[in-house]
């Protein structure tokens, strides 16, 4: 659905309010306000809408990768439920900041137990716990008791990236909905609407680069576009500008590295990749992440390919725990040399 910016800009009472809105980050400026503005997960919104219409809304658990619309969806649902009473009937907490048991005992319990006297047809309040996977296990256990005690007057929506970090006792008390990464076509349509409103020109290669780097994360896509547009002089965004601003290696750079890894000797491949890394300021972690997409396209025996991917995962893990990039670059070149030798023996 197209974003109607005319409705948003006409509601401002003063120029200050208008300027404040215009200066917002794009992720907040274009955050969906109602269910019709959401671009994906129609099955989830339809199910929850039906539950609301039947007055059978349970406690909710939204989980999935970041930037897929979890928080926006529950906020849109809350606006549908409460309208002008939103601020009085909804408590929003970011559990990554307030993650201890004191929050459960004080803020959550106080809000859940308080009476409400507003003119609303909805017989319950709503507590939204964002990034709840950051809560301690003790706090989650205490929250379980609060949910049990105040179910008649309060509904809870637990939002997290990793459902495995939510204790089973909490999971069993909620209806779970998984938010998958956003599909490319509707994401591209929404991004084109936004860049048109912002008077930014993005060529097709640059748009493909944003979608590739975003990996179904709308927040990441918008942050990339806004960052690059701010660094652009004429508001023209190119593929090269996207990769230069984000620090990710360009596909042409990765193709060059793959050629060195497969055809050059150890010393030459190591030196060439090391020089390219320094020249373009690339991270080996980003190189590994992008490299695996190219590796699966190489014509190698399946057993050898599996070993190569296993080596790449070991390198990625070693980097995550602080191992030397130079040492792991040597390991990267070495594992390709071994794969080449194995392929020769296999043939």
UniProtKB/Swiss-Prot annotation:
Where does this protein chiefly localize? nucleus
Which residues bind ATP per the record?
64-71
Q: Is Ubl conjugation among the key words of this record?
A: no
Domain of life per record: Eukaryota
Keywords carried by this UniProt record? ATP-binding, DNA replication, Nucleotide-binding, Nucleus
Q: Name one GO biological process term.
A: DNA-templated DNA replication
SUPFAM superfamilies from the entry? P-loop containing nucleoside triphosphate hydrolases, post-AAA+ oligomerization domain-like
Output the SMART domains linked to this UniProt entry.
AAA
Localization, per the record, is: Nucleus
A Gene Ontology CC term for this entry? Elg1 RFC-like complex
One of the entry's Gene Ontology molecular-function terms is: DNA binding
Q: Name one Pfam family in it.
A: Rep_fac_C
The text of the family note is:
Belongs to the activator 1 small subunits family.
Q: How does it assemble?
A: Heteropentamer of various rfc subunits that forms a complex (RFC) with PCNA in the presence of ATP.
* Role this protein plays: The elongation of primed DNA templates by DNA polymerase delta and epsilon requires the action of the accessory proteins PCNA and activator 1.
Q: Which NCBIfam families is this protein grouped with?
A: PRK00440.1
Q: What is this protein called?
A: Probable replication factor C subunit 5
Q: Which species is this record about? A: Dictyostelium discoideum (Social amoeba)
């Amino acid at each position: 659905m197209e974003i109607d910016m005319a409705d948003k800009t006409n509601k401002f009472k003063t120029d200050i309010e208008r300027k404040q809105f215009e200066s917002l980050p794009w992720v907040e400026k274009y955050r969906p306000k109602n269910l019709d503005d959401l671009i994906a997960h129609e099955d989830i919104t339809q199910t929850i809408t039906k539950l609301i219409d039947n007055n059978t809304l349970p406690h909710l658990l939204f989980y999935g990768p970041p930037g897929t619309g979890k928080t926006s969806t529950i906020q849109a649902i809350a606006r549908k439920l409460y309208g002008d009473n939103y601020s009085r009937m909804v408590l929003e907490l970011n559990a990554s900041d307030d993650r201890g048991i004191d929050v459960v005992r004080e803020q959550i319990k106080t809000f859940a137990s308080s009476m409400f006297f507003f003119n609303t047809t909805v017989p319950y309040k709503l507590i939204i716990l964002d990034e709840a996977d950051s809560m301690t296990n003790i706090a989650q256990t205490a929250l379980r008791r609060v949910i049990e005690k105040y179910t008649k007057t309060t509904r809870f929506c637990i939002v997290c990236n990793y459902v495995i970090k939510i204790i089973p006792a909490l999971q069993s008390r909620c209806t779970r909905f998984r938010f998958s990464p956003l599909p490319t076509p509707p994401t591209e349509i929404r991004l084109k609407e936004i860049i048109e409103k912002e008077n930014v020109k993005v060529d097709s290669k640059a748009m493909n680069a944003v979608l590739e780097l975003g990996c179904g994360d709308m927040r990441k896509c918008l942050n990339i576009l806004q960052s690059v547009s701010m660094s652009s002089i004429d508001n023209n965004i190119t593929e090269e500008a996207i990769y230069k601003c984000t620090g990710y290696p360009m596909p042409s750079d990765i193709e060059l590295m793959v050629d060195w890894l497969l055809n050059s000797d150890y010393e030459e491949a190591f030196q060439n990749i090391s020089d390219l890394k320094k020249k373009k300021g690339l991270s080996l972690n980003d190189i590994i992440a992008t490299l695996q997409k190219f590796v699966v396209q190489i014509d190698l025996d399946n057993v050898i390919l599996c070993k190569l991917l296993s080596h790449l995962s070991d390198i990625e893990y070693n980097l995550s725990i602080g191992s030397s990039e130079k040492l792991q670059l040597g390991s990267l070149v070495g594992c390709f040399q071994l794969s080449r030798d194995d392929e020769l023996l296999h043939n």
